[in-house]
Amino acid sequence: MTPDIRVVIPARYASTRLPAKPLALIGGVPMIVRTAQQVAQAGFPYCVAYDDERIGDVLAAHHIPAIKTRFTHENGTQRLSEVVIARAWTDETIVVNVQGDEPLLPPDLITTVARTLIEHTQASVATLATVCDAPESPNTVKVVCDCAGYALYFSRSVMPYVRDAAAPPVSYLRHIGIYAYRVQLLKRYPQLAPTPLEQAEKLEQLRFLEHGFKIAVAQIDEAPPAGVDSPEDLARVQALFVHE
């Protein structure tokens, strides 16, 4: 039986680098609305998990499904955990996490990451990667996988490290930050303590690996357009909608 697939879009008002980021206008439309419109095209039930009534008011005005969550969450996965528990979704349900600052996300990636989790029955999480041309940058998260497509490790460092020039060529894989989770894991997430590697690399997904959960990784042909993390990113995306 094919599991239910749902999409949750976490939206936090108090962004450090870009205050009130979900409400930033892109072609006259709030960013969180743009992101929700992209997600809706995938055809799965979805909702925005927000933490501030200013976001909630905008979502209501645009008739976007939403659920109010606590503002104390440290990350988007905690927010997802609150949603799946509040909605009493079954353990077999698959939840795709799309960040609220991804107004250009191709909707087909939602289907791809969900299908990856369905096909990898040993995995509790699935995510995506693509070939990386600049592995030296610590802002680019790399992933290495086993022969079955499960993640071995994620890092900001260059990996794999090629020691000898005569070694066979390897492809560096850049992680794409979209995730699919089994609800069973999200329900357990509040009990999973932060881990040393997670804290060292500042990579939330390492918590799952360190606690023994498998992450399936599907390779896609090209990276999606970058999300909005800074005022410069916002200006870049706004320029694409300048004539709307």
Curated annotation (Swiss-Prot):
One GO term in the molecular function aspect is: 3-deoxy-manno-octulosonate cytidylyltransferase activity
Gene Ontology annotations for the cellular component aspect, listed alphabetically? cytosol
- A UniProt-annotated Pfam family: CTP_transf_3
Name the Enzyme Commission number(s) assigned to this protein: 2.7.7.38
Q: Which reaction does it catalyse?
A: 3-deoxy-alpha-D-manno-oct-2-ulosonate + CTP = CMP-3-deoxy-beta-D-manno-octulosonate + diphosphate
Q: Which CDD domains does UniProt cross-reference here?
A: CMP-KDO-Synthetase
Q: Where in the cell is it found?
A: Cytoplasm
Q: Which GO terms describe its biological process?
A: CMP-keto-3-deoxy-D-manno-octulosonic acid biosynthetic process; lipopolysaccharide biosynthetic process
InterPro entries in the cross-refs: Cytidylyl_trans, KdsB, Nucleotide-diphossugar_trans
Task: Give the UniProt keywords, A-Z.
Answer: Cytoplasm, Lipopolysaccharide biosynthesis, Nucleotidyltransferase, Transferase
Q: Which Gene3D superfamilies match?
A: Spore Coat Polysaccharide Biosynthesis Protein SpsA, Chain A
Query: Where does the protein principally reside?
Result: cytoplasm
Q: In which pathway does it act?
A: Nucleotide-sugar biosynthesis; CMP-3-deoxy-D-manno-octulosonate biosynthesis; CMP-3-deoxy-D-manno-octulosonate from 3-deoxy-D-manno-octulosonate and CTP: step 1/1; Bacterial outer membrane biogenesis; lipopolysaccharide biosynthesis
Q: What class of enzyme is it?
A: transferase
The Swiss-Prot or TrEMBL record describes its family as follows: Belongs to the KdsB family.
Q: What does this protein do?
A: Activates KDO (a required 8-carbon sugar) for incorporation into bacterial lipopolysaccharide in Gram-negative bacteria.
Protein known as: 3-deoxy-manno-octulosonate cytidylyltransferase
Q: Which organism is it from?
A: Dichelobacter nodosus (strain VCS1703A)
Species lineage: Bacteria, Pseudomonadati, Pseudomonadota, Gammaproteobacteria, Cardiobacteriales
